[in-house]
């Protein structure tokens, strides 16, 4: 929960900075309004910056243009604000690691990505729980430590869930680097009851990883040795796996780096990186897919 603590402190700092911008003689309502506006402006600015960077680095010509780009920006800003101003700093404190074992349906383990925590999955977890699935979440160490440390933590959680319900299938639902970790662990374990759903995962790296030491640590660059070596030997995902990605992802650049060119691929347009993990349409589609 260290990330939640950091995000809480950052949020409090933004609220304080916004309130401090008001005149000393200003009303309490004026100070409160400015306190709330500043975090929103930061979210909007970061979303615009991400869109511009992705557009400059991705020459595929598949990204949204014109009015569709503005719709994308609005949706991604809402997802960004929800995740980093509400769900991850605040709601994550109220999410237990796993549900009580009452369901006979599959288990779902939600795996977050870079600079995120379990709060990312607040809405989706409630929806799957309401459908009768047993759900679990995990907080992984920062990616820049080492992908192997993340895999060790994830493996420990998987073994615990499998031991508690050995007859139930276990679905790893991973967003971003969580999707990469889920695929790597599936490849390592070779467990017939283990299933993978990856969402917006940089399976072949992202050009934006250069600022985070992306060759050996952190989100991987396309030239990362460890990722190239893994992809060269990895097994193809089975037909019951899902690899969802969007041509408008502003974090995985180029967006096609998420593609595996397998039957598991499902390509969408109009969704940003965080929007993929917060979309009601994608949630409902995935619920239907897992029922089949």
Please identify what each model-predicted range represents.
Residues 107, 239-245, 264-266:
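Catalytic His-Asp charge-relay segment
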Residues 147, 272-280:
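Catalytic histidine-centered segment of alpha/beta-hydrolase-like enzymes
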Residues 277-289:
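Post-His helix in hydrolase/transferase enzymes
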Residues 246-252, 273-274:
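Acidic catalytic loop of the alpha/beta-hydrolase fold
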Residues 109-119, 123, 127-235, 244, ...:
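Serine-dependent carboxylesterase/thioesterase catalytic core
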Residues 255-262:
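Short loop/helix-cap segments at secondary-structure boundaries that form the rim of catalytic
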Residues 259, 268-269, 290:
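A hydrolase-biased, glycine/serine/histidine/acidic-enriched motif that marks catalytic-domain neighborhoods
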Residues 1-108:
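Flexible, membrane-associating and regulatory peripheral segments of lipid-active enzymes
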């Amino acid at each position: 929960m260290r990330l939640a603590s950091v995000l809480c402190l950052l949020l409090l700092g933004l609220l304080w900075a916004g309130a401090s911008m008001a005149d000393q003689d200003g009303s309490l309502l004026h100070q409160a309004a400015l306190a709330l506006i500043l975090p929103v402006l930061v979210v909007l600015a970061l979303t615009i910056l991400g869109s511009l960077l992705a557009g400059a680095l991705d020459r595929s010509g598949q990204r949204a243009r014109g009015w569709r780009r503005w719709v994308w920006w609005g949706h991604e800003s809402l997802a960004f604000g929800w995740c980093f101003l509400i769900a991850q700093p605040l709601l994550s404190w109220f999410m237990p690691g796993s549900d009580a074992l009452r369901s006979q349906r599959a288990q779902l383990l939600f795996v977050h990505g870079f600079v995120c925590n379990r709060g990312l999955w607040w809405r989706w977890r409630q929806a799957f729980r309401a459908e009768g699935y047993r759900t679990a979440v995990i907080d992984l160490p920062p990616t820049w430590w080492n992908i192997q440390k993340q895999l060790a933590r994830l493996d420990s959680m998987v073994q615990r869930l499998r031991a508690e319900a050995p007859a139930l299938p276990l679905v790893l639902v991973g967003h971003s680097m969580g999707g990469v970790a889920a695929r790597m662990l599936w490849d390592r374990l070779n467990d017939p009851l283990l299933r993978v759903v990856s969402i917006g995962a940089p399976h072949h790296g992202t050009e934006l990883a250069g600022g985070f030491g992306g060759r050996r640590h952190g989100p991987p660059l396309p030239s990362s040795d460890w990722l190239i070596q893994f992809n060269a030997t990895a097994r193809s995902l089975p037909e019951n796996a899902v690899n969802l990605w969007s041509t408008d992802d502003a974090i995985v650049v180029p967006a096609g780096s998420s593609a595996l060119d397998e039957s598991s691929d499902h390509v969408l347009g109009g969704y940003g990186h965080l929007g993929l993990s917060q979309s009601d349409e994608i949630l409902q589609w995935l619920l239907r897919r897992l029922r089949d």
